[in-house]
Amino acid sequence: MRRQPLDRKETRMISQRCREAAWCWAAVWLLLFALAAARAAVPPKIPLKAEPFRLNQVRLLDGPFKHAMELDHKYLLSLDVDRLLHCFRVNAGLPSSAKPLGGWEEPKSEVRGHSLGHFLSACAMMYASTGDEALKAKVDRAVAGLAECQAKIGNGYLSAFPESFIDRVESLQPVWAPWYTIHKIYAGLVDVYVLCGNRQALEVVTKACDWVKARCDKLSDEQMEKMLGNEHGGMNEVLAEVHALTGEEKYLKLAQRFNHRAVLDPLAKREDRLTGLHANTQFPKILGAGRQYELTGREDLRAIATFFWDVVTKERSYVTGGNSDGEVFSPKERLSKHLGPTTTETCNTYNMLKITRRIFGWEPKAEYADYYERALYNHILASQNPETGMVLYYLPLKSGVPKVFGTPNDSFWCCTGTGMENHAKYGDSIYFHEGDKVLYVNLFIASELTWAERGLKLRQETRYPDEDRSRLRFACEKPVEMSLRLRHPYWAASGFEVAINGQTQAIASRPGSFISLDRAWRDGDTVDIRMTMTLRTEAFRDDPKKLAILHGPLVLCAGIEPGRPTAAIVSGEGEIVSHIRPVPEKPLTFIASPKVFRVTGPQAGRELTLIPLFRQYKKPYIVYWDVLGEAQWNATLAEIEAEAARQKALDAQTVDRVVIGDGPSEQAHALAGEKTGAGPHQERHWRHAVDGGWFSYQMKVLDGQPMKLLCRYWGSDSGPRVFDILIDGKKIATQRLNNNRPDQFYDEVYPIHAELTKGKSKITVRFQAHPGNMAGGVFDCRVLKSE
C-alpha cells in the first residue's frame, strides 16, 4: 500500500522536534568541519564539481546498513590495542606482554602490521560516523604507541617488521609486500589526523615520510620502477595526501616517484593490459593517480582513472560489481569461464568504490552512482555475516560454494582490514553537493544529513530495498533555495515517480540520470520517490547463455544444500522471469519454478527460493545459470553420469594417490623440494616449483610391473612452465604447459616401465623445473595400474 503523505501541520511538528535535537549537535560538528578544512594546507588545482559530505554530517537510521555498521562498531571496540601494537613494539626493541594476534598478523607474517593501519582508519571513520569517544580514545592510544616505537628506532622508520624487508624489496629479493603494509599504516595515521584531529598522528606520518624520502633518494628512477613490481599499495596516494596536509612539495614529488609506469602509462594511452595482473595491486595506483590529478591538474592522470574505471566496470566485472578470479584479472573475452570459489576479492570492490567516489566528484554522472549502488549492495553489504559481523575474503560465484567468513583474532586477511573500513563509512557517498546550490541524493539509505552551512537538515526515511520508495523530509529555520538532484536508477525503467508535499510532479526523466527539483525548500517539505523494481536478467558479454537474476539493483541467489551442483535454466516458452513468482508477505523473496530452474543434487526437482545475495550467508548458493534446451540438459546429465563412472574406474585403477595441497597426504608421501609452494584454484589445490626449483613425492608401486603416472593440470596455465618428470632420478617425460586446454582441467598419463619398479615397493616422483621456469601446477598425482 502506498504511504499517505502527512499533512502540513503534522510535518512541521515532527520537523521542529528533529531540529531541536539536532542543531546543538550540528554546531559542534560544524566547528570540527572548519578545523578539518583548515588542515588542508594545499587547495586542489582541480576543484570538485560534486563534494561529498563529511561522515560526521550524516547519521544512519535503522536499516541493513546501520545494522552492519553497528556490528563493525562492536568489533572495533573489541580489538585490543596492545595486541595490535605487539609486533611494532617487538620490532622497535620495546617490551610487550601482549598475546600476539594470529593469521596475517602472527609474528612471522611478512605483512604483520597492516591491520593496525586499517584499524586506525576504521576507528577514525566510525568515530566520525557515530561520535563515540571510546573509539577516539583507542586510536589516540594506538598513535601514542606508534610514536613511541618510531622514537625508539630513531630514523623515522615505522613498521612491525624490520627495515631489512625494505632492503630486500629494493634489491628485488623475495619478500611479500612491505610497501603495501607501510601504506596501510600511513593511511591510518592520515585518517586519524583528518577525522579525529590527532596532531601526533600527523607528526608521526611526516617523520615516516621523511624516512621514505631518504630511502628513495638513493634509488635511480630505473631502480624505483623495478622495485614497484612488488605490491606497494597506495604509496603514491598517501604521500600526495601528506603533501596536501603539510604543503611540503617534497612529498608530492616523492608520490610521483611511486607512480608505477609499467601499469599507468598504458592506461594513460587507453590501452588495457590488465589481463593476468594481480588485481588488487593495481587499484591503489589508480587512486593515487586520481589524487595527484586533483593536486596538479595533469590531465593524463585523470585519463588513467577514468579509462581504468570504464574498463573494469564495463568489461571486467561480474553482476555483483566485483571483479577478478583467484585475485587476477581474467581475460575479459572469457570472463564467463572464470567462476570459481575465489572470485571477486572484497578488497577490489572496496577500492573500486573509492575510485568511483573520486571520479563522481570530478563529473557527477548517474552511471557512477549506479555502479556504486550495485557494488555496495551486492558485494560490500554481502561481505559481512549479519549475525557475527565477521567479513569474507572472496565472494564466490561458482555454484554450490558458500561464503567463508573470518574470525575475530586469527584471520586478519587484507579483506579483514578493508572490511573494518567498509562498514564504518556507509554515510560517505549518500549525499553530495555542488557549492551551496545543489544537493545530490545518490543512494536510498535511511539517514539524516545535517548541512549546517545552509541551516538545513534532511531526513531520508526508507525501508529500501524491501520497499521501492523513499521519503525526504526537510527541516530548516528559513527557506533554502537550491536544486535537489535525485538519481533515477538505471534499472528503474518501468516507473520513477516523484511527489512534493503529496503532489505528483510532471518530470522528464530517463533511467540512469539525475532529475532536478529547483525551488525554495521550506521547513516540513517532503519529497516522496517511488522506483518500480522488476525482475530481469543480466548475461555475460562473452556468453549470452550464462546469466544472473536481479530484482531492481539486487542480485538474487538460490540457496542450496552442500555439494557441487550443475545449475541451468531449461528455457521453455515465455520470458525467463515469468517462471519466478514473489512470496506474499516476504519482501525480496521469490520462488523459481523447478520445471525451468533445474539443479542436480539433493534439490533436484524441488522449488528453489531466490533471495538477495546480501541476505544469503548460511548456505551454498547459485548466482549464475546456464540457459539450455531440453536436449542440452539431458546431455549434461549424461556427461555427469559418465564423469562419475570415469572417476570410479580411475579410483579402481589407482595404486597410490597424493592429494595435492593436503598437508597430511603430502607428508605421508614424504614431500620434499626447493622453491615450491601450493595454493587453491577452482576448488582444487596445486603445487608448483618456481625458478628452477623442484618437488617430489614417494609413491607406492607394484614390484616389477609396468605402471602409469597420471598428473592433472589446469589447461590455461602458460608462461615459462617447462619441467622434467623423473622416477628415482631417471627422466620419463618433459612437460610444457602453454595454454594446452583453455579453461578446463585435463590429465596427462606417462608410462612407467617395469625396470623402474623392479624390486621396489615405492618410487620417488620428482618434478624438476627447467632453469628460469616453473614446474606445475600439478593438481592431482596418481600411480595407476598399467591395465
Where in this protein do the model-derived segments appear?
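Bacterial N-terminal signal peptides
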Residues: 24-36
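Aromatic (Trp/Tyr) and acidic
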Residues: 42-133, 137, 168-195, 232-250, ...
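Bacterial N-terminal signal peptides that target proteins for export
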Residues: 11-27
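Beta-strand-rich ligand-recognition modules
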Residues: 503-524, 530-544, 678-708, 712-786
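Bacterial Sec-dependent signal peptides at the C-terminal "C-region" and cleavage site
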Residues: 34-44
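C-terminal beta-rich recognition modules with glycine/proline-rich loops and embedded aromatic residues
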Residues: 305, 370-378, 383-475, 510, ...
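Short, Lys/Arg-enriched N-terminal segments with co-localized hydrophobic residues
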Residues: 3-12
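Hydrophobic, small-residue-rich alpha-helical packing segments that form membrane-like cores
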Residues: 204-286, 291-295
